[in-house]
Amino acid sequence: MADNKTTTIEPINRRSANITQGKSRAPNRSMYYAMGYVEGDFVKPMVGVANGHSTITPCNSGLQKLTDAAIEGIEEAGGNAQVFGTPTISDGMAMGTEGMKYSLVSREVISDCIETCVSGQWLDGVLVVGGCDKNMPGGLMGMLRANVPAIYVYGGTILPGHYQGRELNIVSVFEAVGENAAGKLSDHDLREIEKRAIPGTGSCGGMYTANTMSSAFEALGISLPYSSTMANPHDEKTNSAKASAKVLIEAIRNDLKPRDIVTRKAIENAVAVIMATGGSTNAVLHFLAIAHAAGVPWSIDDFERVRQKTPVLCDLKPSGKYLAVDLHRAGGIPQVMKLLLNAGLLHGDCITIEGKTMAQVLKDVPDRPRADQNVIRPIDQPLYAQGHLAILKGNLSPEGAVAKITGLKNPVITGPARVFDDEQSALQAILDGKIQAGDVMVLRYLGPKGGPGMPEMLAPTGALIGAGLGESVGLITDGRFSGGTWGMVVGHVAPEAAAGGTIAFVHEGDSITIDARQLLLQLNVAEAEIARRRARWTAPAARYTRGVQAKFAFNASSASQGAVLDAY
């Protein structure tokens, strides 16, 4: 008997047809003809390519070849590539200056650019190419807001530099500044380290923020397997960009969208991988924002829940030995994920951009890491039994604060507060030898509203490490830390000082306790005295009254909510 059922096939240009089909769209099509389109192109999908190429930073200066490869892949697969630009800020270059306050702002600008171009131009899909830290969360947030089929192409990691038999990376230079100030490193060696630390294109080489977020994107399933740990100069990175474009065309055909992929279970997978690889504290802030863009319930306490059951399996910088290129050679993120999956710590049923489940993607990955490498540990021989990114609470951070707690020789410190209302004066105090072992530095008015923009504190923390104080001095801030930071440091303190959080009421010499075991951040001052200080406190005047910084300060939510601008 004949099957009388009919199958409706959705056109692959289902969105762009709004501006390319019908007589009334003749003026619209004339604009395309001006760019070399022919009549047959209007039945093909219009595929955006958000190109983050920039000569501002080595993180992004190698992206054009990836964009070109993606364009080629789109066209070979039957699509029309439409390229538009997205900006970047170099965190490494802006670090320690007023420019660093624009870093987190750029996350929002990037997401706005992508949402605006994709939605305004009725694009059928988008491929995002990015490199530096905020390119990743900004890109994915824009993809999720627009919610058309999309894939992320990470620009790739940088190769290590070398000097006197030692491997170098960008954090080596920040720490060398502290060593030089402490008289432990000559001016000549400082200059040589400066020149040799970054030998070419790519993002900073350890499990810092860019590599953390790219690894997490692979774990989400929004990027291709193995792509997150490839080096930018290598041909496989370019080939991966082209392959990503072809996968995207299939996703457009199947109408597989980012919000189908970035679910609560997928975010749990990503956070488990962040914990297992020893990733950046910034991932906490960014995944709160990503979940918000995806419409997924996710709180700061969810990170602590995942942390407590996930071991650290990878020995990676900043606190470990190895770089992302070493992780790639050892089996990459798929090897880490397979170990977690077999241990029941991943959701194998999550869908990926290829249309496969994560379990299917990992099917042929070995059950145990290779014996000839030391980067990835077996699940029964972890580096640490629990994850490293802990959420600390107490009267200094009732909404939470973020700390890296693994590998600390002194997980508890109680000491006198050394209070600074800006980063530069704190850095100068370290370089001048005014900070002593046992002190607890308090850097405040550096949160989302107070900074504004929640700048990273790599210059002070790097100087502490270089001066030999990384294990003996505590540092807390309502700002952020670079992915390259390690030591007894606590960031993202919420509520922030500018919002009247307790951190605003700390006085020089007050006793503060950081207890990584009890997950406690406490001002050891009587509640009655804190209440008196609160009653006398007035919010400082806004540091910016015009432009993007003023808009960010006015609209930003608490760090405990991701410092997003649309939490209305």
UniProtKB/Swiss-Prot annotation:
Cofactor binding, per record: Binds 1 [2Fe-2S] cluster per subunit. This cluster acts as a Lewis acid cofactor.
GO BP term, example: isoleucine biosynthetic process
GO MF terms, alphabetically ordered: 2 iron, 2 sulfur cluster binding; dihydroxy-acid dehydratase activity; magnesium ion binding
Catalyzed reactions per annotation: (2R)-2,3-dihydroxy-3-methylbutanoate = 3-methyl-2-oxobutanoate + H2O; (2R,3R)-2,3-dihydroxy-3-methylpentanoate = (S)-3-methyl-2-oxopentanoate + H2O
Enzyme class: lyase
UniProt binding sites for [2Fe-2S] cluster: C59, C132, C204
UniProt-annotated binding residues for Mg(2+): D91, D133, K134, E456
Cofactor: [2Fe-2S] cluster; Mg(2+)
InterPro entries noted in UniProt: DHAD_IlvD/Edd, Dihydro-acid_dehy_C, DihydroxyA_deHydtase, DiOHA_6PGluconate_deHydtase_CS, ILV_EDD_C, ILV_EDD_N, IlvD/EDD_N
Swiss-Prot/TrEMBL keywords: 2Fe-2S, Amino-acid biosynthesis, Branched-chain amino acid biosynthesis, Iron, Iron-sulfur, Lyase, Magnesium, Metal-binding
Active site: S482 (proton acceptor)
Biochemical pathway: Amino-acid biosynthesis; L-isoleucine biosynthesis; L-isoleucine from 2-oxobutanoate: step 3/4; Amino-acid biosynthesis; L-valine biosynthesis; L-valine from pyruvate: step 3/4
Family statement drawn from the similarity comment of this UniProt entry: Belongs to the IlvD/Edd family.
Official protein name in the record: Dihydroxy-acid dehydratase
Species name: Verminephrobacter eiseniae (strain EF01-2)
